[in-house]
C-alpha cells in the first residue's frame, strides 16, 4: 500500500482561492474545493474561505479530533466553539426546522477530502547536477525518503532517476530519509538568515550512462 504524501506548509498555502482551497489540521492536509462547490454561495463558507491555505488545528480538540466546544452562557448547553462564526455543518445555536442535517459526516470527519500529511518539519537542501553544474534549492519534508525528494526534483530535471545521488562522495540510500542517511539538521540558529544557504546540505548528482536518456 502506497503511503500518504507529505506536504510543506508553503505548498498548502498556495491553494488559497475559492476554486482551489486547501487547509491543514491535526497533522493532515485536506482539499475542501469539492465542499465549496457543493455549498456554493452559502454564507456559512465564509470562515473556511478566510482560512484558505492555512492551518486550522486551533479549531479542534486534539483528543477528540472534533471542533472545540464550550458552555453557552445563555442556555448552559455544550455547543461548538466557533469564534470566527458558524460554518458549514455546524448546527444553529437554537433548534430550527429548516436546518438540513442529512449530510452524513461533517466535513472535518470526512476522509474524502484528505490529500496527505502535513510535514512536522521541513528542510532546505541544494541539489547540484555535476553534469550541467546547475544547482537547485528545494524545501522538502523531513519525513520524505530520497526517492520522494527525487520526485519533487523531477520538475527541474525529468531524468533525475538517471543520476546517482551522493553526499561528500558517498552514495545515498534512496529508500531512506535525509536523517536516516546521516545528513544532520541544519543549524536552527541560521534558519531564516542570509547565511541559511551555507548550512543547507548539498547533494551532488552524478550522471549514469544508461538508456533512460534516450
From Swiss-Prot:
GO CC term (a single one): cytoskeleton
Keyword Metal-binding: yes
Keywords assigned: Cell projection, Cytoplasm, Cytoskeleton, Heme, Iron, Metal-binding
Deletion phenotype: Mutants are able to survive to adulthood. Embryos constantly develop three otoliths in the otic vesicle at 24 hours post-fertilization (hpf) and recover to two during later development. Mutants show impaired coordinated ciliary beating in the otic vesicle and olfactory epithelium.
Coiled coil: none
GO MF term list: metal ion binding
Binding site for heme: 39, 70
Domain Cytochrome b5 heme-binding stretches: 4-70
Subcellular location: Cytoplasm, Cytoskeleton, Cilium axoneme
Family: Belongs to the cytochrome b5 family.
Function noted in UniProt: Radial spoke stalk protein that binds heme under oxidizing conditions. Required for the coordinated beating of multiple cilia maybe by functioning in a redox signaling pathway.
Full protein name: Cytochrome b5 domain-containing protein 1
Species annotation: Danio rerio (Zebrafish)
